[in-house]
Swiss-Prot record:
Subcellular location, record wording: Cytoplasm
GO cellular component, one term: cytoplasm
GO molecular function, one term: DNA binding
Name of the protein described by the UniProt record: UvrABC system protein B
Highest classification ranks of the organism: Bacteria, Bacillati, Bacillota, Clostridia, Thermoanaerobacterales
Domain of life according to the entry: Bacteria
Keywords: ATP-binding, Cytoplasm, DNA damage, DNA excision, DNA repair, Excision nuclease, Nucleotide-binding, SOS response
The keyword Transmembrane helix belongs to this UniProt entry's keyword annotation: no
Length: 662
């Protein structure tokens, strides 16, 4: 397979060419860390695509959540239709990790709902890395979580060609060894079926195609790719590589060694717990682990096999797990998108996992080796990366300290400049704001207002309504889908002013917004830090008449730095426009490609359980609401709450079935 082929109607413009050139040159010189400081709307993704095409290396793009990763994945797929653009995020729709709460003696079993489509995409991503070099994998931070041994994964691959001497039973045995399940009736992903001398395999990385292997005696006669639904032959293959159905698949020899090693650890830990006087814990561990060992012996697999991954891969205690990073070749390139958010996330993954496992190990639910099924620490992540380009409009201290060069991309292809920032006193701020809203709305534009507290946002919203202004309040209790609809309505002009507390997380790139008002701008804190202020100011940068008004009595250090940086960028942009005769134009964007809500997990909502529902729609919406709360509780390690919510959901599902049968 050749290199990357970038397909686009656009050519790099503004300062994109110099950014591409400098970063490509930096990689070639061997710079380990570089930063692309690109303002909102300057085409950072297009710049990344051009760098990938020029360097021709396997590339990992890390985003800070699934939604942002999905957005980048679809953009890169458009830029590289002929190359392998893959998607690697957590495959859980819902995940309640295994936990133990000593205070109430409550053990919560792992409960998860796996998204089959995402699991298929994960397998497709790892398989692509062993088959070709023109690979881009867009991943969330879950790429630093443990995965099986890449050497095993490659060695266990079943490679078949027509004319090869392979007996039918040998192929079947090999498929079972790499975790494929024989099922002649229900033919789904990760299964195979046998009909006489024909074996059909549904690879883990395929979604609607399967492989048909036709044998003649002990020889492979033909290999065809077939449509799973119709059985129609889509084409014949000269070679097929079938990768394991699980990333934790391993050879029988390794499994036998792992079983011996687990048993040794069990005996040692059992003795240790007994000596500490923890009789109940010792017996619990003995029973649970022996059950898992029997499953491994007979089936080659057990529930929670990832907790034994250190034994299976033969790693020493305390050693880092294998992750997606280990599947890449040595010369791979990493882009960390929105690095000011992603880097702190990568730093925090290990500690949260460790604190949950401590109770499980201490109380005899797991062996101490379960600690080694974990995400990488940040230091281990740093050791595994080859060359990194951080991408952000507001790079954090880590990126600025480590980068061997910071390349700025300040010119927008549309000629738009950063908005003018005005500071006004707090006294009379509401009356002044109303006057500014009326002026802006009269021109057909919209307004964003950001406050510090929920109470203030609600009061302001009520007051503006009384003054005859069409306003909506965007708060954390609103679900993602409804939020998308609210922003769509704002763009369509169904209302003119949107009030919120944190307008950063929404991905609110709305061209119709010509005014952003920041109330209490001088109250230092997370929402009024330099980074947050610059990001908020950027919300007005999609409109040629964009302005930002900060209401403050004193100018804080954060405000001063944010205003100075905005004015510096604005000056460079205006000089560029004047030199090249460019007139800024407001972005014209169809309302259907509206926004990208970049926050997957919502804040919790209050839920009071009502006795009985009789309306199926009400039950369904309540289940959806509870599932959202349950996921959030699991993320925040509130396992008892998540377990209670799960039980409520199960109860409501039963009720839904009963109502449907009436």
């Amino acid at each position: 397979m050749g290199g990357f082929k970038l397909v686009s109607n656009f050519k790099p413009t503004g300062d994109q060419p110099q950014a591409i050139e400098k970063l490509v040159e930096g990689v070639r010189r061997g710079y380990r860390y570089q930063t692309l400081l690109g303002v909102t709307g300057s085409g950072k993704t297009f710049t990344m695509a051009n760098i990938i095409a020029r360097l021709n290396r396997p590339t990992l793009v890390i985003a800070h959540n699934k939604t942002l990763a999905a957005q980048l994945y679809s953009e890169f797929k458009e830029f590289f239709p002929e190359n392998a653009v893959e998607y690697f995020v957590s495959y859980y729709d819902y995940y309640q990790p295994e936990a133990y709460v000593p205070e109430t003696d409550t053990y919560i079993e792992k409960d998860a709902s796996i998204n089959e489509e995402i699991d298929k995409l994960r397998h497709s991503a790892t398989a692509a890395l062993f088959e070709r070099r023109d690979v881009i994998i867009v991943a969330s931070v879950s790429c630093i979580y443990g995965l099986g041994d890449p050497i095993d994964y490659e060695n266990l691959m079943l490679s078949l060609r027509p004319g090869m001497v392979k007996d039918r039973d040998e192929i079947i045995r090999k498929l079972v060894e790499i975790q494929y399940e024989r099922n002649d009736i229900n033919f789904t992903r990760g299964k195979f079926r046998v009909r006489g001398d024909v074996i059909e395999v549904f690879p883990a990385s395929f979604s609607n195609k399967a492989i048909r292997i036709e044998l003649f005696g002990d020889e492979i006669d033909r290999i065809a790719e077939i449509d799973v639904l119709t059985g129609e032959v889509l084409g014949y293959r000269k070679h097929v590589a079938i990768f394991p159905a699980s990333h934790y698949a391993t050879s029988r020899d390794k499994l036998e060694r792992a079983i011996k090693s687990i048993r040794e650890e069990l005996e040692e830990r059992y003795k240790e717990l007994k000596e500490m006087g923890k009789i109940v814990e010792a017996e619990r561990l003995w029973q649970r682990t022996n059950y898992d060992l029997e499953m491994l012996q007979e089936m080659g697999y057990c529930k929670g096999i990832e907790n034994y991954s250190r034994h299976i891969s033969g790693r020493p205690p305390g050693s880092p797990p294998y992750t997606l990073l280990d599947y890449f070749p040595e010369d791979f390139l990493i882009f960390i998108d929105e690095s000011h958010v992603t880097i702190p996330q990568l730093r925090g993954m290990y500690n949260g996992d460790r604190s949950r496992k401590e109770a499980l190990v201490e109380y005899g639910f797991r062996l101490p080796s379960a600690y080694d099924n974990r995400p990488l620490t940040f230091e281990e992540f740093e050791q595994r990366v080859n060359q990194v380009i951080f991408v952000s409009a507001t790079p954090g201290p880590y990126e600025m300290e480590h980068s061997e060069q910071v390349v700025e991309q300040l010119i927008r292809p549309t000629g738009l400049v950063d908005p003018e920032v005005i500071v006004r006193p707090v006294k009379g701020q509401v009356d002044d704001l109303i006057a500014e809203i009326r002026k802006t709305v009269a021109k057909g534009y919209r307004v964003l207002v950001t406050t510090l507290t929920k109470k203030m946002a609600e009061d302001l919203s009520d007051y503006l309504k009384e003054m005859g202004i069409r306003v909506r309040y965007l708060h954390s209790d609103i679900e993602t889908i409804e939020r998308v609809e609210i922003i769509r309505d704002l763009r369509l002009g169904k209302f003119d002013v949107l009030i919120g507390i944190n307008l950063l997380r929404e991905g609110l790139d709305i061209p119709e917004v010509a005014l952003v008002a920041i109330l209490d701008a001088d109250k230092e804190g997370f929402l009024r830090s330099e980074t947050s202020l610059i990001q908020t100011i950027g919300r007005a940068a999609r409109n040629a008449e964009g302005r930002v008004i900060m209401y403050a009595d004193t100018i804080t250090n954060s405000m001063r730095r944010a205003i100075d940086e905005t004015n510096r960028r604005r000056k460079i942009q205006m000089e560029y426009n004047e030199k090249h005769g460019i007139v800024p134009k407001t972005v014209v964007k169809g309302v259907r490609d509206v926004i990208q809500a970049t926050q997957v997990a919502e804040k919790e909502e209050k839920y009071e359980k009502t006795a009985n529902f009789y309306d199926p729609d009400v039950i369904k919406s309540t289940i959806e609401q509870l599932e959202k709360e349950m996921r959030q509780a699991a993320i925040e390690l509130q396992f008892e709450k998540a377990a209670k919510l799960r039980d409520m959901i199960l109860e409501l599902r039963k009720q839904l079935e009963e109502v449907s049968l009436r």
